[in-house]
Regions:
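Surface-exposed cleft-lining segments at the edges of enzyme active sites
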Residues: 170-176
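Domain-scale terminal segments
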Residues: 1-170, 197
Length: 254
């Protein structure tokens, strides 16, 4: 992960409109995974503000990777507010290290992950959204994936915290016909349509029914065998149905 320092200068820096416009701008960059920090902390500099952007590639932030919405907000900040942008490359993030974005893509998996919900199935490396064609119905962004990802993270958080809605949340995460899974499966279909790469939806699994029964379970949609021989609960996925485009894991709740 690369750190890029952005300095924004101008008389309108710090105004109400400035923070409104920059908020929309950075939200757009986050929605495409051009940056991975969902929150941004400003530091004062002469005649402006500075902040660090965390990017999958050195130039992830550039307009060539932006949606029309990201470009629009940047131009409004520059044009209406007369502000200047200065991007400076700082180096690799010591925590993340170098991000590997696979060029060869055997198949894709939709699953929430560290910075992008699209995972290459063989290498298990994540692919920023801006690396694939737009998936939203307006043909200009990835809002469909963003909305699903937001829902998934909130449901997952509800399950993880327990007590309040835990069973409902677990069913949403692990059942293929839940509202959450249906939303994600629709995203998978669209991703496969625009990329022409098989795209699978990841089904969470935390069933407490023992390893033997867990390994015997069939694809929940078609009922066919889908266990990958030799899989363990340490594997990222242990079940794969090519017909239904579903992938799942062995339960660690043994």
């Amino acid at each position: 992960m690369h750190i890029v320092k952005l300095n924004i200068t101008g008389k309108e820096v710090g105004s109400e409109e400035f923070f409104e416009f920059t908020n929309y701008y950075f939200q757009s960059l986050y929605g495409t995974k051009q940056i991975i920090n969902e929150e941004w902390q400003y530091e004062p500099i002469d005649n402006g503000l500075s902040l660090n952007l965390f990017c999958p590639e050195k130039d992830s932030y550039s307009e060539k990777n932006s949606t029309i919405y990201g470009i629009k907000w940047k131009k409004r900040i520059e044009g209406e507010l007369k502000c200047k942008f200065d991007f400076r490359y700082m180096g690799l993030d010591p925590e993340f290290g170098k991000t590997i974005i696979p060029k060869k893509r055997d198949f894709l998996i939709l699953k929430t992950a560290r910075f992008s919900p699209i995972i290459e199935g063989s290498s298990l490396n994540q692919i920023p959204l801006y690396k694939i064609p737009y998936t939203h119905h307006d043909g200009e962004c990835y809002n469909d994936i963003n909305f699903w990802e937001n829902n998934y993270e909130r449901v997952e958080g509800l399950w993880f915290n327990g007590i309040v809605g835990e069973r409902w949340a677990q069913n949403q995460l692990q059942n293929h016909d839940s509202d959450l899974s249906k939303q994600g499966i629709d995203c998978c279909k669209k991703i496969e349509e625009v990329t022409q790469i098989p795209t699978y939806y990841f089904l969470f699994n935390y069933r407490a029914w023992g390893q033997k029964k867990d390994k015997e379970r069939k694809c929940p949609r078609c009922g066919n065998d889908w266990l990958i021989d030799g899989s363990t609960f340490n594997d990222f996925y242990a079940f794969k149905c090519d017909d239904c485009r579903l992938i799942s894991e062995l339960s660690s709740n043994r």
